[in-house]
Amino acid sequence: MSLGIDMNVKESVLCIRLTGELDHHTAETLKQKVTQSLEKDDIRHIVLNLEDLSFMDSSGLGVILGRYKQIKQIGGEMVVCAISPAVKRLFDMSGLFKIIRFEQSEQQALLTLGVAS
């Protein structure tokens, strides 16, 4: 299975919705698309919706951590939302939720960043 990447900008927030599998085959594509958007759009924060992501490996964690560091460097924040149980377990084991905020829904994530959805 491949990775579907849907991105749009709401005010200064890049909303990323992933579907399918984020692994060593697809991680570089996500990295490039997000980096391009951060460079061309006026992005301050990232909301990462993982509701329809069925699988993720350590390559996916690495890409997410890298984008987290990128957005933190400009004083922004990353919020993960609507995560599937299997992927949530990976986040819990890796300790990423100690540094990246989690919200139940994309709407709630946007509200925490000061954007009305």
From Swiss-Prot:
Keywords per UniProt: Phosphoprotein, Sporulation
Limits of the STAS domain: 3-113
InterPro entries with a match to the protein in the record: Anti-sigma_ant, Anti-sigma_F_ant, STAS_dom, STAS_dom_sf
Pfam hit, one: STAS
GO BP annotations listed: sporulation resulting in formation of a cellular spore
Signal peptide: none
Residues carrying Phosphoserine: 58
Listed Gene3D superfamilies: STAS domain
One GO MF term: anti-sigma factor antagonist activity
Physiological role: In the phosphorylated form it could act as an anti-anti-sigma factor that counteracts SpoIIAB and thus releases sigma f from inhibition.
Protein name: Anti-sigma F factor antagonist
GN (gene name): spoIIAA
